[in-house]
Each structure stands twice: as C-alpha cells, then as structure tokens.
C-alpha cells in the first residue's frame, strides 16, 4: 500500500467526532423522514437510508418535499420530472405549475416580526424592517418598475452593497417576473461590464459611495462608466447610502434619478398593492456569473422554482431552520450566498444584512452582532475563520453566543485545524457546517445536517436529492480516494440554460464534456466510506498530476499553512514542451518572517511525511502576493496561464489583479 493510500486509510479510520445531534430533539429532517416513510411505505431508519432513497427515487423525493415545504402556487404541477431524461438533457421540473418566488418569500403574515436587521461598518445603529414594511417596500419598488415598463423577462440589476434596498429591489423584480442580477461595489468597471453587458439590463440600482475597512470609497465615477457601457439601460436609480441626497450630484449620469423620486413615480392616490405574476416553475429568476478569471464570465440562468425548492430543502431540512431563527451570512450581493441567504425569508426566519469589513473596528464585529441581535446561524468564508485563529481570537471568552446554534463555512475548503479552533475557542456545542456547491447550481451539493455527527475535517454528508459521487479518470466511482465530483441524476437547481448560448454548446462544454451525460462540477473531492463525509480537495482544473500522482492543491495548503512563518501559499502545475508536469509552490511570508532555506526544507519534510515523497513540490519560491477573486477565492488557473506565458485578459474578477504580474518571467521557471 502506498504512503498516500495509508494516509487516506488512517484519516478514514480516525473519524474524530466534533459534534453530535441531541437525540432528544426532533428535527425537521426527522419529521420529513417519518412523513416519507408513512406516505411511501418505507422503513427509513436513518439519514443514510433517506439519502439513498432520495437519489434512487428522485422524482418521488422532490414531490414529497414540495408537499412538506408548503410551497405557495396558484396551479399544481402535472408532472414532477420526466425520469427518462438525464441531467445532460436539462429536463423540465414541475411542469404545469404556476408560482412566484417573491410571493413565497413574503408569505409569512406576522406583520410586526422583523424580517431584516441592517448593520453597517462604523455605525452603531441597527436598522429593522418588519415583514409588513418589507411587503410595502417591495410593492413600491414593483409599482415603479411597472410604471417605467419593466415586464416579464426584462433584466433588472443591482450594483449595490448588502442592504435592505437590494433585497427589496430583487423581490420586486421577481414579483413581476423580471430577471435579477447583481454585483457588489468592490467590482471594478471592467468586471461589471464583463457581466452586465452580456445581459443588457433595462434598469440598474446603485449607490454613490460605500464604506469598507474604515475608508469611504466613492462610487459615482465607476457607475458613470458602467452606465456608458450599457446602451440598453433605460433608467439608473441612485440610492443615497453614505451621503445625504443634497450632497450627491448625478447630473453626469444619463437617465438617472434618486430612489425616492423613482418610488414616487409608481404611486397614485393610494399605496400600491403587491401583485405576484404567476409563472412557470422554470421561469428565469436570477442570472449568475462564473468567476471570469480565465475568460468572459458564463451567464447562468437559474429558475424561480428550482432555486426556491432547493434553497428551502437546504434551509428547512439540512439547516433545521424555522421562523424563530436569525441568519447572518457574511456575503456581498455579488456572491451566490447572498441569494441563498435571502431565500431563507421563505421559512419566516429573520436576516441580518451586514455591509462592511468583518475585521473593523475589531475582528469581533460579527460576534458582537451575534450577541446584540441574538443571531442563531452565522455563515462566513473559511478564510475568515483562519484569520481569527491567526489573530488568536477567542470569542468563547469574550462573548456570550448563547443563541448561536450553527456556524456555516464555504468559499474554500475548511481545514481540519479550523474545526478544532471553532470547538476550542468559539463554542463547543455549535454545529459547524462546512457547505459546498457553487454558483453553477446556486446552492450546495453537500453540507450541514442537523441529524448526524460532525467529523473533523469533513463536510457532513451529501445533500438529499443530489446524486453526488467521486469518479476517477475512467469514470468509475471511487471511495476513500480522490476523484472528480460528479452528479449523475437531474436536479431542479441546475441552470435552465446559459444566456446567449442558443445551441447550448457552452453549457455542454462547461459540465458534460469530461463524462458524457454526467455533470462534472470541476471540484476534486474524497468521500469517506465509513462516515459518508466529504473532504474537498480544490478545483479539478487546478489538479496536480506530477508523475501520475493526482492530488488537489488544498492537500498541500493544509500542511503548508500550519507553518506560522507562512501567511499564504499557492500551488500550481508547470508544463514543459514535452507535456511533463512539475509542481511549483509559492509562499507569501508572514510579517516578521523571511524566506529561508531551512523553512523550505521543513516544508518539504512536512509534505513528505504528511502525504508522500511524490507530493513534494519541485520548486518552492517566495512571492509577494497571491491573486484572489473579489469573492475571496484563491485563483490558481490564472497563475498557471501566466507562468505558461499566456495573457489573462479578464482581470475584472480579481480583487488584486496586479498580483498576476508577479508570476511573469520568473527566472527559476524558465529552463523547464
């Protein structure tokens, strides 16, 4: 047995439990399992039984969950899905049904309950929007949109911070049947135009400035250039955000008006009433964008019904969310986690919208909000938890956190040491849910589960209805070994199509070119046959394969970033003219530390001991910067292109595009 195989076997056998569900508490997952057993005459003893039934009989599963979730519709479906069609056929779901996404999110009638808590960097005040106020605002937005001619299928976009008005504008667009798309103010002009110019919106909402990391960032000049690049825009609505209206000059922005004037344009003698256009399940709701780090972003069209039922499944069953929960997911409107978070309104839960740095004025800012508001579910990126650990933050000692029952993490693989940190320094009784999926499905393939244990370093389980497997290069299922994450059966949350992809060729190339008829997600993972848990190993397009040994970059990161001397690292392949591959590891040194031969030796030894000799990089070099997307994801593929002498043209998706130039013409890489 190879050293790598022995290591993986040892990891599987270790299976350290970090959290277990309270056997005395009945979860919504338990209730659903019992309901399915009764309705279908099945003996489903545990989650594993339920999961395997849900993918084997996926049509029955989704029908049962439709019933369990209480989705509001004006017409019931004729057929759940044509099971003779595969996932590559993109079958129609819930044919014949009529519904509205916004109606489902606004269905809860406890008018005085808070729907939105709104918090901003540098402001002590926390604003509150009740469900009744939210409905009134959505009605105002929708009436003004209708007045200017927005109709079904039109694109309405937001270039906005994470705010109540972003939620209101999105829900108003959805109530009409318009298609919503959004990006955050930290995107530059090119990044925004790379996205919005492809979908040609009729209406855009934006702000004049934002505050981040203690600084005010003016936004009007960027907005003016964006508007110039969108010739089909009929209206620009400016929402005063940092400054009062009288101090904002929008005269240079054509077809622009302030928000209050826009809302007034749709009102008559009486306040407008909410109207929900009844639409097919497959009607487009969102256009989401790929990262665009290696080319023009793909424009993924997600359906109203597919998004709704998938998000409800994740919130209600996997997250055990109820109307008593308060959810804060630290996100911008440019990340799919914003859409995912907002859908939680359909459970009656309250949302906390935070705009600003999670480290300013102190790294405790989110924990402060947990205690002030009584947040029950906190979501963040894996990187933030690593930063807190590096700063030796111990919220367990400084905060109460008594309401917090779940911490969610996504964006990048959650390291095993982060599990230890959370349970040692944050809260010992919290469910730590690492969740993973992507913008491509606007949801998760796998994630948190309130009915089964949490094991260190593992995502708890594959989610219901998601026929996820790990495949090797020959298309065979592998267990306990690294493989390509695939989905073998249809799911309602896959994009209905790509925008401007009339013959579907881009869609097929994106997901079905590697394994015909099977969705290849582009992630590398390992499924533990003992626990059912999953370890994510990085993007498969950044998979390393020196001398025939395939592994993911995160396997290297997990070892390297345990060194205090290293602030960050990047691991990429380099190819020579003969197609031979070697692995190059770049280290960004932590403050106060220098790049030394002894450190290189220690890192090589640690990788050799922890993985195998064949995992040890051929070169370990210092770098001054590592490129990230605006959503905080490390970008390996673009660096691979740069060191191969190629040009990365689409730099708008990077938070630090200048860092790419650090990898050009590196002397040590020239003679391979």
From Swiss-Prot:
Cellular location(s): Cytoplasm, Cytosol
Any one GO molecular-function label of the UniProt entry: short-chain fatty acid-CoA ligase activity
E.C. code: 6.2.1.16
Gene Ontology terms: cellular component: cytosol
Gene Ontology biological process: adipose tissue development; cellular response to cholesterol; cellular response to glucose stimulus; cellular response to testosterone stimulus; fatty acid metabolic process; liver development; positive regulation of insulin secretion; response to ethanol
Keywords: ATP-binding, Cytoplasm, Fatty acid metabolism, Ligase, Lipid metabolism, Nucleotide-binding
Keyword Lipid metabolism: yes
Tissue expression remark: Abundant in male subcutaneous white adipose tissue after weaning. In white adipose tissue, it is preferentially detected in mature adipocytes but not in preadipocytes. The expression in primary preadipocytes increases during the adipocyte differentiation. In brain, it is expressed in the midbrain, pons/medulla, cerebral cortex, hippocampus and cerebellum. The expression in the cerebellum is restricted primarily to glial cells, while in the cerebral cortex, it is restricted to neuronal cells.
SS bond partners: none
UniProt key word ATP-binding: yes
Reactions performed catalytically: acetoacetate + ATP + CoA = acetoacetyl-CoA + AMP + diphosphate
First-tier enzyme category under EC: ligase
SUPFAM superfamilies reported for this sequence: Acetyl-CoA synthetase-like
Highest taxon in the source lineage: Eukaryota
Protein function: Converts acetoacetate to acetoacetyl-CoA in the cytosol. Ketone body-utilizing enzyme, responsible for the synthesis of cholesterol and fatty acids.
Family recorded in the similarity comment: Belongs to the ATP-dependent AMP-binding enzyme family.
UniProt protein name: Acetoacetyl-CoA synthetase
Organism: Rattus norvegicus
Gene that this sequence comes from: Aacs
């Amino acid at each position: 047995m190879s050293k790598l195989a022995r290591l993986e076997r040892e990891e599987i056998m270790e299976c350290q439990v970090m959290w277990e569900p309270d056997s005395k508490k009945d979860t919504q997952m338990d209730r659903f399992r019992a309901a399915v057993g009764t309705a279908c005459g099945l003996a489903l003893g545990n989650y594993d039984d339920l999961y395997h039934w849900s993918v084997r009989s996926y049509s029955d599963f989704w029908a049962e969950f439709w019933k369990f979730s209480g989705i509001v519709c004006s017409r019931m479906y004729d057929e759940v899905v044509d099971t003779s069609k595969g996932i590559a056929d993109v079958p129609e779901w819930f044919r014949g049904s009529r519904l509205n996404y916004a109606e489902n999110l606004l269905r809860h009638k406890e008018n005085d309950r808070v729907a939105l808590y709104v918090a901003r960097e540098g402001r002590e005040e926390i604003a509150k929007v009740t469900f009744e106020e939210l409905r009134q605002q959505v009605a105002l937005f929708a009436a003004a949109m209708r007045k200017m001619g927005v109709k079904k299928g039109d694109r309405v976009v937001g270039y906005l911070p994470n705010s109540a008005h972003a939620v209101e504008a999105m829900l108003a667009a959805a109530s009409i049947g318009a298609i919503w798309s959004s990006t955050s103010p930290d995107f530059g002009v090119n990044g925004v135009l790379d996205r919005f110019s492809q979908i040609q919106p009729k209406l855009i909402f934006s702000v004049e400035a934002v505050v981040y990391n203690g600084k005010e960032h003016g936004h009007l000049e960027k907005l003016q250039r964006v508007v110039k690049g969108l010739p089909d825009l009929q209206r620009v609505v400016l929402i005063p955000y940092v400054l009062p209206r009288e101090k904002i000059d929008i005269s240079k922005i054509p077809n622009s008006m302030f928000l209050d004037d826009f809302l007034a344009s749709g009102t008559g003698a009486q306040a407008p009433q909410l109207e929900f256009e009844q639409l097919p399940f497959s009607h487009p709701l969102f256009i989401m964008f790929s990262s665009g780090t290696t080319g023009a972003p793909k424009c993924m069209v997600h359906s109203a019904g597919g998004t709704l039922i998938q998000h409800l499944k994740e919130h209600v069953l996997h997250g055990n969310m109820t109307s008593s929960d308060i959810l804060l997911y630290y996100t911008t409107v440019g990340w799919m986690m914003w859409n995912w978070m907002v859908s939680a309104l359909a459970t009656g839960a309250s949302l906390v919208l935070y705009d600003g740095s999670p480290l300013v004025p102190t790294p405790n800012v989110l924990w402060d909000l947990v205690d002030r508001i009584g947040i029950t579910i906190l979501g963040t990126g894996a990187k933030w938890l690593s930063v807190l650990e590096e700063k030796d933050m111990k919220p367990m000692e400084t905060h109460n956190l008594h309401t917090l029952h779940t911490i969610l993490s996504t964006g990048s693989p959650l390291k095993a040491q982060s599990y230890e940190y959370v349970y040692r320094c944050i809260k010992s009784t919290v469910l730590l849910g690492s969740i993973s999926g992507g913008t491509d499905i606007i949801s998760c393939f796998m994630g948190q589960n309130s009915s089964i244990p949490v094991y260190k370093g593992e995502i708890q389980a594959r989610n219901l209805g998601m026929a996820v497997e790990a495949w090797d290069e020959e298309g065979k299922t592998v267990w306990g070994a690294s493989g390509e994450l695939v989905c073998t059966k249809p799911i309602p949350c896959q994009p209905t199509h790509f925008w401007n992809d009339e013959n579907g060729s881009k869609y097929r190339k994106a997901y079905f070119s590697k394994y015909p008829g099977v969705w290849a997600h582009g992630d590398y993972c390992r499924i533990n046959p003992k626990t059912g848990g999953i370890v994510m190993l990085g993007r498969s397009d950044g998979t390393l394969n020196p001398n025939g040994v395939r592994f993911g970059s995160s396997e290297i990161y997990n070892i390297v970033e345990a060194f205090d001397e290293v602030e960050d690292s990047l691991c990429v392949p380099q190819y020579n003219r003969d197609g031979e591959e070697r692995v190059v590891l770049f280290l960004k040194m932590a403050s106060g530390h220098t790049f030394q031969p002894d450190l290189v030796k220690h890192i090589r030894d640690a990788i050799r001991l922890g993985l195998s000799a064949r995992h040890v990089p051929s070169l370990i070099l210092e770098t001054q910067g590592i490129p990230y997307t605006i959503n905080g994801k490390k970008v390996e593929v673009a660096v691979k292109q740069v060191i191969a002498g190629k040009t990365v043209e689409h730099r708008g998706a990077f938070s630090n595009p200048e860092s790419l130039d650090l990898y050009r013409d590196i002397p040590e890489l020239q003679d391979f």
